C-alpha cells in the first residue's frame, strides 16, 4: 500500500535520477517505510497537501528546464501537473509549511544553467511556499567539478549516497520503531537476500492456449495511451557517403493528423528489439521460453505506471514484452543488480558448481550494493555491456518472469529534432545511426537507430510530437548565429526554413567535405540565394578546411563579424550538437571574442554580458 505522507518524486531525462529514486525507494521499503514513488509530472497536485516528507531527485535539461517527465504528465500534457500548480501566483506563502523536504539535483557543469531544474523547485517549494529543508539541497555534477562534489573528482553516485544516508538517518531518528501485528517493535531492515515482491506481477491468463496462431504480428496493438500517433514512412535515405563509417539518415514520415510544429520542436519515436535479441534472451532463460507465448495478465495494472507512455502491447506475452517493452540491450543500472542478485542459485538448467555459484552471487551483490561503483562501471559501462549479455554471463541467474516488471528496464522513446520546414506536411528527421565497437571488440548498435534501419517506405512508425516553445517573440526578427556540428544541423535547418530571423549565419562542421557535408546542395543553394551566410569546417579534411578544424575555429576567424552581430545588432546565438567539449569550447570562444572586440574593462565584464544573454535567451544551447 502506498503511503501519501512519504513521497519520492523524480524528474529524469536520461534515467539517472529515475534509477537513484528507485534505489532510495528500495532502501526505504526494506526499512518498512511505505511510501509513494512517482514522476514529478504524474504526481497529483492535491496530494502534496497530504504529504509530510518529500524527497525530490531531479536533473536539468535544455535551457535550464525541468525534464519533460517533471513538467508534463505521461500523456504529454503540462496542464494539471504539480509544477503548473506550484507556479500559480495566488498560492499562499505557507502552503507547504507542513512539508519536510530533501532535494538532490543531477547536473553537468558544462551547461550554462547548471542544476537549474532543482534550483527552480527549491526556490518555489522552500523559499516561496514554506516547506522546511531536512538538510541543505545537494547538487551533483557529472564532471565532478561543481555542486556538492566540487573539486572532489567524485561522480554523481557519491553525492547520491550522501543524500540517501542523510534521509535514512533522519527517518530512523524520527521513527525508530514500527507497528507490526498491533505491537510496536524496533525498525530493523530486511535481510539483503530477501526479495521484495512488487505490486505488479505477471500471471498466466485464465484464457487457455498460446498466441502463436491467434494473432499474427500485423495485429499487434498498443492500448492505454491515446496520445500516440502513427506515421507512414516516406523516406529512409543515407545522406553520408556509402563508404563513410558514419551512416546519417534523412528519415521522413507522413504524420497522422498533419500536426503543426515549429523550430525547436521534437518527435519521440518508440523503438523495438530485434527478434534475434528476444530469442537470445529466451535461450538464456529457458524457463521463460517454455511459456513465452502464453497470454498474460498484470496484477494491479491500473496502478502500474510503466505503460503510461506508449501504452501496453496486446497480445501480452513474455515474447511481446521482450520485443516491445523491456530494454534488454540497454546497460543495466545498479538497481537491476540490487534487485536480481538473490536470484543467482543452483537450478536444473545449470549443473551445480558451488564455488562458481558463490563467486557469481558475490559479484552480483557487489554490483548491487557496493558504493564504490568502479567495478560496476568497468564491467558494464566501459564495454557497454547490455542486460542481455549480463544474463548470458551469469549462468546461475534464474530470473522469475513473474516479477520482470520490477527489475527489467523499460524501452523509452527516443527524441529527435525536426529538420523539415514547419510548412511541410511531412516530418523530416536527421539521425546518426549508432554503431561502434567496444573494448570487447563487439559491434554495438543503438536500439532506436537499429530499429529505424529496418523501416522502409509505407511502414508504420509510432510517434509523438512535442512543442518545445523554443523561441519567444522578443528574439524573433533579430540576426541569429547558428553553430551546429554534425546532426546538430537538424533544428537549424528547420529554423532557417521558418524565415523567422532577419539575418541567418550558419557555422556547420563535420569530418570530411566529400563524406559528411550534410544537405550540402540545400545549404549551398540557400547561400547562393542569400538566405544564409554559410561558414563550414571539416576536422579531418585540411585540404577543404585549411583554416578551421572545428566550429569554434571558424567562429574565431569571423570574430569581428560575430562581435558586431552580438554587441551592435543584439544577435541570438544558438548552439546544437553533442555535449562534451564542443559547447564548452564554443562558449569560451564567444567570451574571448567579446573580450577582444567589446571594449570591456576586464574578462569578468565579458562573462557577465554572456550570462545576461543566457538569462534573456539570446544564448541558447541544445546538446545531448
UniProtKB/Swiss-Prot annotation:
Coiled coil: none annotated. Its cofactor is FAD; FMN. FAD binds at residues 384, 414-417, 446-449, 624. It comes from the Eukaryota. Pfam families: FAD_binding_1, Flavodoxin_1, NAD_binding_1. FMN binds at residues 12-17, 59-62, 106-115, 142. Keywords: Cytoplasm, FAD, Flavoprotein, FMN, Mitochondrion, NADP, Oxidoreductase. The keyword DNA repair does not apply. GO terms for molecular function: flavin adenine dinucleotide binding; FMN binding; NADP binding; NADPH-hemoprotein reductase activity. GO terms for biological process: iron-sulfur cluster assembly. It catalyses: 2 oxidized [2Fe-2S]-[protein] + NADPH = 2 reduced [2Fe-2S]-[protein] + NADP(+) + H(+). GO terms for cellular component: cytosol; mitochondrion. Residues 6-168 form the Flavodoxin-like domain. Interacts with DRE2; as part of the cytosolic iron-sulfur (Fe-S) protein assembly (CIA) machinery. HAMAP family: NDOR1. Belongs to the NADPH-dependent diflavin oxidoreductase NDOR1 family. In the N-terminal section; belongs to the flavodoxin family. NADPH-dependent reductase which is a central component of the cytosolic iron-sulfur (Fe-S) protein assembly (CIA) machinery. Transfers electrons from NADPH via its FAD and FMN prosthetic groups to the [2Fe-2S] cluster of DRE2, another key component of the CIA machinery. In turn, this reduced cluster provides electrons for assembly of cytosolic iron-sulfur cluster proteins. Positively controls H(2)O(2)-induced cell death. This is NADPH-dependent diflavin oxidoreductase 1. It comes from Kluyveromyces lactis (strain ATCC 8585 / CBS 2359 / DSM 70799 / NBRC 1267 / NRRL Y-1140 / WM37) (Yeast). The gene is TAH18.
Amino acid at each position: 500500500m502506498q503511503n501519501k505522507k512519504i513521497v519520492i518524486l523524480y524528474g529524469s531525462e536520461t534515467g539517472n535520477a529515475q534509477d537513484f529514486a528507485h534505489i532510495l525507494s528500495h532502501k526505504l521499503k526494506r526499512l518498512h517505510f511505505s511510501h509513494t514513488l512517482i514522476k514529478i509530472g504524474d504526481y497529483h497536485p492535491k496530494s502534496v497537501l497530504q504529504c509530510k516528507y518529500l524527497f525530490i531527485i531531479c536533473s536539468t535539461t535544455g535551457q535550464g528546464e525541468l525534464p519533460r517527465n517533471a513538467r508534463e504528465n505521461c500523456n504529454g500534457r503540462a496542464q494539471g501537473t504539480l509544477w503548473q500548480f506550484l507556479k500559480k501566483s495566488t498560492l499562499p506563502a505557507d502552503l507547504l509549511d507542513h512539508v519536510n523536504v530533501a532535494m538532490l539535483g543531477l547536473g553537468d557543469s558544462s551547461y550554462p544553467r547548471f542544476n537549474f531544474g532543482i534550483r527552480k523547485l527549491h526556490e518555489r517549494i522552500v523559499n516561496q511556499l514554506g516547506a522546511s529543508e531536512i538538510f541543505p539541497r545537494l547538487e551533483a555534477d557529472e564532471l565532478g567539478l561543481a555542486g556538492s562534489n566540487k573539486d572532489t573528482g567524485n561522480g554523481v553516485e557519491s553525492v547520491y549516497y550522501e543524500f540517501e544516508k542523510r534521509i535514512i538517518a533522519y527517518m530512523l531518528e524520527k521513527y525508530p520503531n514500527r507497528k507490526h501485528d498491533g505491537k510496536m517493535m524496533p525498525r530493523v531492515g530486511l535481510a539483503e537476500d530477501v526479495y521484495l515482491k512488487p505490486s505488479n506481477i505477471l500471471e498466466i491468463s485464465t484464457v487457455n492456449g498460446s498466441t502463436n496462431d491467434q494473432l499474427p504480428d500485423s495485429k499487434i496493438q498498443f492500448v492505454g495511451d491515446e496520445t500516440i500517433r502513427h506515421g507512414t514512412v516516406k523516406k529512409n535515405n543515407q545522406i553520408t557517403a556509402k563508404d563513410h563509417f558514419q551512416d546519417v539518415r534523412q528519415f521522413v514520415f507522413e504524420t497522422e493528423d498533419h500536426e503543426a510544429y515549429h523550430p525547436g520542436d521534437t518527435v519521440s519515436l518508440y523503438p523495438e528489439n530485434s527478434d534475434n535479441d528476444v530469442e537470445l534472451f529466451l535461450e538464456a532463460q529457458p524457463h521463460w521460453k517454455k511459456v513465452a507465448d502464453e497470454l498474460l495478465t498484470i496484477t494491479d495494472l491500473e496502478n502500474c505506471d510503466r505503460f503510461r507512455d506508449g501504452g501496453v502491447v496486446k497480445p501480452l506475452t513474455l515474447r511481446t514484452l521482450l520485443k516491445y517493452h523491456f530494454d534488454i540491450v540497454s546497460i543495466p543500472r545498479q538497481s537491476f543488480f540490487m534487485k536480481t542478485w538473490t536470484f543467482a542459485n543452483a537450478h536444473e538448467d545449470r549443473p551445480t558448481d558451488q564455488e562458481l555459484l558463490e563467486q557469481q552471487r558475490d559479484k552480483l551483490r557487489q554490483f548491487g550494493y557496493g558504493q564504490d561503483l568502479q567495478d560496476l562501471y568497468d564491467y558494464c559501462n566501459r564495454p557497454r555491456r547490455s542486460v542481455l549479455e549480463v544474463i548470458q554471463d551469469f549462468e546461475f541467474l534464474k530470473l522469475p518472469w513473474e516479477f520482470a516488471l520490477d527489475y527489467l528496464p523499460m524501452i523509452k522513446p527516443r527524441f529527435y529534432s525536426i529538420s523539415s520546414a514547419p510548412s511541410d506536411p511531412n516530418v523530416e528527421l536527421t539521425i546518426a545511426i549508432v554503431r561502434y565497437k567496444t573494448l570487447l571488440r563487439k559491434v554495438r548498435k543503438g536500439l532506436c537507430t537499429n530499429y529505424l534501419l529496418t523501416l522502409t517506405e509505407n511502414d508504420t512508425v509510432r510517434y509523438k510530437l512535442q512543442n518545445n516553445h523554443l523561441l519567444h517573440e522578443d528574439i524573433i526578427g533579430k540576426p541569429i548565429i547558428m553553430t551546429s556540428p554534425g546532426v546538430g544541423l537538424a533544428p537549424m535547418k528547420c529554423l532557417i526554413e521558418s524565415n523567422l530571423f532577419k539575418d541567418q549565419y550558419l557555422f556547420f562542421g563535420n569530418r570530411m567535405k566529400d563524406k559528411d557535408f550534410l544537405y550540402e546542395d540545400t545549404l549551398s543553394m540557400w547561400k547562393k540565394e542569400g538566405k544564409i551566410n554559410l561558414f563550414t569546417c571539416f576536422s579531418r579534411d585540411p585540404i577543404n578546411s585549411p583554416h578551421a578544424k572545428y566550429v569554434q575555429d571558424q567562429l574565431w576567424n569571423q570574430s569581428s563579424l560575430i562581435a558586431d552581430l552580438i554587441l551592435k545588432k543584439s544577435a541570438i546565438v544558438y548552439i546544437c550538437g553533442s555535449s562534451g567539449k564542443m559547447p564548452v569550447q564554443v562558449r569560451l570562444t564567444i567570451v574571448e571574442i567579446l573580450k577582444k572586440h567589446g571594449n570591456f574593462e576586464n574578462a569578468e565584464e565579458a562573462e557577465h554580458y554572456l550570462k545576461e544573454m543566457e538569462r534573456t535567451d539570446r544564448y541558447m544551447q541544445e546538446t545531448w
